[in-house]
């Protein structure tokens, strides 16, 4: 069973009513919700003007203390037994699914230079899906051995293989860079590069960068989602904790960065324009 926590804080009123509020004790309301065979324990902690005392919830929360589904606005003490659930696996799937869908729309994939930025080597199984559309693929990773088997398989089935390297400079001329995990270090790219990643980058990048994804939540799950939670975060919990792996096939309908939002159609139009600009610059040089 998954556990979600909502905090409702009531400010103490003034005067006599405020005295009454002082006598009111914090309380927890628990509701068990069900969707598609999955159960969610939704705890609403009601606080009357005090700092929440989450230790009172230990028995209610049970074994889920270190993976509580909640808003990032809820802050647990560093030495607390309570930890907010965080996992990027589902968001990585959204990133790669959109990239593959975008490539499937292109009629110029044979000329595309594609980069995969995967320092931890966690996304090696993604390689064959990319090479289905282009044979000019460069993987930048600190764990090249993680890509050995997939490269061998691609060579057997497609007669081509990717370039696997630790050198980020090799990404400079890529038209599309796919980074399924949050980018923490800068790497080489150019102004005509489209970069799809997971979470807002922590480093300066050149190009068009998109990192937040939007989609319609499957029927049923939307009814059990706490209102204050973002859809992507809640589905991440369903995927990783609730083993709802079918969510991993979702293709986003929109994506955004810090200043712009794109539909899949407008993203493709922008990608096509970037590619043409890149080709024009190459011809001029």
Predicted regions and their residues:
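A glycine-rich, Thr/Ser-enriched phosphate-binding loop motif common to dinucleotide/cofactor-binding enzymes
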Residues: 83-101
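Adenosine-phosphate binding glycine-rich loop
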Residues: 198-285
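Short, charged/polar "capping" segments at the starts of alpha-helices
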Residues: 75-79, 123-125, 144-151, 184-187, ...
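Metallocofactor- and cofactor-centric catalytic cores in central/energy metabolism, strongly enriched
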Residues: 8-17, 22-78, 100, 271-285
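Short, aromatic/basic amphipathic alpha-helical patches
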Residues: 15-23, 78-83, 128-130, 148-158
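Rossmann-like adenosine-cofactor binding region
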Residues: 161-222
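A short, well-structured beta->alpha microelement
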Residues: 26-30, 45-58, 152-173, 182-186
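Glycine-rich phosphate/diphosphate-binding loop of Rossmann-like nucleotide-binding domains
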Residues: 106-170
